[in-house]
Amino acid sequence: MNASEFRRRGKEMVDYMANYMEGIEGRQVYPDVEPGYLRPLIPAAAPQEPDTFEDIINDVEKIIMPGVTHWHSPYFFAYFPTASSYPAMLADMLCGAIGCIGFSWAASPACTELETVMMDWLGKMLELPKAFLNEKAGEGGGVIQGSASEATLVALLAARTKVIHRLQAASPELTQAAIMEKLVAYSSDQAHSSVERAGLIGGVKLKAIPSDGNFAMRASALQEALERDKAAGLIPFFMVATLGTTTCCSFDNLLEVGPICNKEDIWLHVDAAYAGSAFICPEFRHLLNGVEFADSFNFNPHKWLLVNFDCSAMWVKKRTDLTGAFRLDPTYLKHSHQDSGLITDYRHWQIPLGRRFRSLKMWFVFRMYGVKGLQAYIRKHVQLSHEFESLVRQDPRFEICVEVILGLVCFRLKGSNKVNEALLQRINSAKKIHLVPCHLRDKFVLRFAICSRTVESAHVQRAWEHIKELAADVLRAERE
């Protein structure tokens, strides 16, 4: 493919993408395929001679699209949103064209410097404490990670290195292995599974702190666990507080647990993967109060801020905590500016070496929507979730399971878990809308998350009518 054909095919691809997005409402949100459907539809080996672009596009529609779960359908209410916008798509095209691997300033100065500026833009939108920003006189800064899972792991590994160095400085006879077996990290029992995975990868004990009646971590439960573990000779060193849990969008109490972590010299990492986007709205900023106690903070613009995956924003108060844990300087990666104090080499802030020009997406989206446009988008989703909540509350057969704060509604039929499992099975088998469940204590609960950029009140109303019809069928079957 030469440049001339690329221009032509590029226009065709943009048309295909635009048609897909405009017509997505007409596609069944969840596919009809079974596991293994795709292999019989494509050759067993790559072609020896080139295929045509027309053949490939035809196969996309015939082979790929039938197996796609349409996350951007206005009838997709599962998981949490994944962001999608035309400005971000355009930026991704440009990112692919530039094709740099921005592991250092020298590898691509623009890639590095735009990321630094965009992370400061975003930090200011959130009104983060200045300690997290990449200001000349400060020690903090921001970096784009691939996911919140990655950010949690990076924070845990940095905290682990920091505590080992601190203890060995005080007691040089201590080995790393001796320290490691005593380290213990904490999170709420509502924290995302990626926190547990970070503990497994980091080789440290992770303990779940029981949450309160609102599914939030509180000071008393944390303090009790710390005292018990210290008495047993363990070394508390790391804690993850969640703002907007995956199960029910509950919020750990940072104003309570933050001071405890600071007093006990425990690294506090705040995971706001979903909810963080809402903090750009003044009416939701109070949910972030207490972040001043954190050592690191993370949320995903690729969830709810119209920046396509992957783009997970992470800030630290002391960037040397990351670079001290991950810095390696082989000769082939060195450059003349690396010790100048004027530049950032992001390879020292992350687990991989390579990194894409992800800040382009942020730059395009922030400029083409503006802060006001992004705020309006968040507010619309929250309004739609409250609309759905109101519909549920009007039906005496159903109950709301936890306070609706942002764009997630947790609800269920009053009664047994069995009847709710049957309802969810009917909903997802019908494939008109898509939901996923969670467990809140011993209750099986349905999650209704406002996800699509194009979802409107009419889609929420239709979804509720559909749920009510299926609920009537389930209750009728139970009586029979």
Curated annotation (Swiss-Prot):
Ranges for region 2 X approximate tandem repeats: 58-178
Protein name: Aromatic-L-amino-acid decarboxylase
Pathway this chain belongs to: Catecholamine biosynthesis; dopamine biosynthesis; dopamine from L-tyrosine: step 2/2
Modified residues (N6-(pyridoxal phosphate)lysine): K303
Annotated gene: DDC
Transmembrane feature ranges: none
Keyword list, A-Z: Acetylation, Catecholamine biosynthesis, Decarboxylase, Disease variant, Lyase, Pyridoxal phosphate, Repeat
Family according to the record: Belongs to the group II decarboxylase family.
PROSITE patterns, A to Z: DDC_GAD_HDC_YDC
